[in-house]
């Protein structure tokens, strides 16, 4: 397993990442290979435009049913919308990971 040095976000989320307002992302196992203490480059998913850099703070397992208001607040989206988005991106996947990060200074 190699250490990931880049991460992509939907373009509509990148202003929240770049402002430091969005501090977590929920991904499946295939996108969970980030290492706390490393810096990664943030790109838009749609256009591969570099947005900023973030420092990975933690990578922790998370079951779909455990997604709650805290995660929604950190993701800057309402809980029902967050759950719907996660199900759309990762259909029928219960084993997820929450990646906590901060904007690189």
From Swiss-Prot:
The keyword Acyltransferase does not apply. One of its GO terms (cellular component) is cytosol. InterPro entries: AC4CH, ASCH_domain, PUA-like_sf. GO terms for molecular function: hydrolase activity, acting on carbon-nitrogen (but not peptide) bonds, in linear amidines; N4-acetylcytidine amidohydrolase activity. Keywords: Hydrolase. Residues 8-93 form the ASCH domain. It catalyses: N(4)-acetylcytidine + H2O = cytidine + acetate + H(+); N(4)-acetyl-2'-deoxycytidine + H2O = 2'-deoxycytidine + acetate + H(+); N(4)-acetylcytosine + H2O = cytosine + acetate + H(+). The active site is at residues 22, 25, 75. Its EC number is 3.5.1.135. Pfam families: ASCH. It comes from the Bacteria. Belongs to the N(4)-acetylcytidine amidohydrolase family. Catalyzes the hydrolysis of N(4)-acetylcytidine (ac4C). This is N(4)-acetylcytidine amidohydrolase.
């Amino acid at each position: 397993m190699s250490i990931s040095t880049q991460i992509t976000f939907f373009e509509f989320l990148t202003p929240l990442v770049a402002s430091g307002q969005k501090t977590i992302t929920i991904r499946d196992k295939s996108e969970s290979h980030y290492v706390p203490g490393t810096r990664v480059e943030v790109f838009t998913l749609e256009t591969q435009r570099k947005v900023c850099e973030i420092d990975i703070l933690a990578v922790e397992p998370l079951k779909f049913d455990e997604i709650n208001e805290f995660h929604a607040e950190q993701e800057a989206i309402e809980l029902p919308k967050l759950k719907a988005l996660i199900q759309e991106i990762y259909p029928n996947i219960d084993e997820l990971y929450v990646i906590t990060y901060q904007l690189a200074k």
